[in-house]
């Protein structure tokens, strides 16, 4: 079987590595900042998601789902899945 996503509107913020205050305002207590090593050090936002901790790297989007759940999304996947809406 195949399924299509229902057309929903989600809130999104992009993690730049420099916008920690905006990310904190968007995510609330569900985010922490630090460095991960892969193997070089990279600034990261650690997000508490429904599946556990996930990391957003600079350039990634953080999406707030329909029930307020948070999850990171890589830019290429975001571009294929979402489009801007007029407010």
Q: What kind of region is each of these model predictions?
A:
Residues 1-43, 49-50:
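N-terminal domain-onset segments
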Residues 51-87:
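Short, compact, well-ordered microdomains
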